[in-house]
Amino acid sequence: MSAGKRKTYNTKLDRWMAANGVKPAHLAQESGYSRQHLLRIRAGRMEPTRRCIAEIVAACRRLSHKPVRASELFELGD
């Protein structure tokens, strides 16, 4: 991996971050969750709580200035 490139994962959150130019460190700072915690979610190794989803969605809205929905970032089960 070359400098300036980050590893990408096949999750909605990670694809959205890449498409919108949101860096993991910025999302961590804005959401209040650690980069390590967000990495586990981005990589699909951990399911976020409802509270965590709400915080990440709010952070993505602030960072992108777009009306982001939870369903754009996460696979929401029934």
Feature-to-residue mapping (PLM):
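A short, Lys/Arg-rich alpha-helix, primarily the initiator
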Residues: 1-26, 30
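Residues in the helix-turn-helix
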Residues: 26, 37, 72
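A short, basic/aromatic helix-end/turn motif that makes direct DNA contacts
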Residues: 31-33, 61-62
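Recognition helix of helix-turn-helix/homeodomain-like DNA-binding domains
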Residues: 33-48
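Key DNA-contacting residues within the recognition helix of helix-turn-helix
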Residues: 39-40, 54-57, 74
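DNA major-groove recognition helix of helix-turn-helix/homeodomain DNA-binding modules
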Residues: 51-70
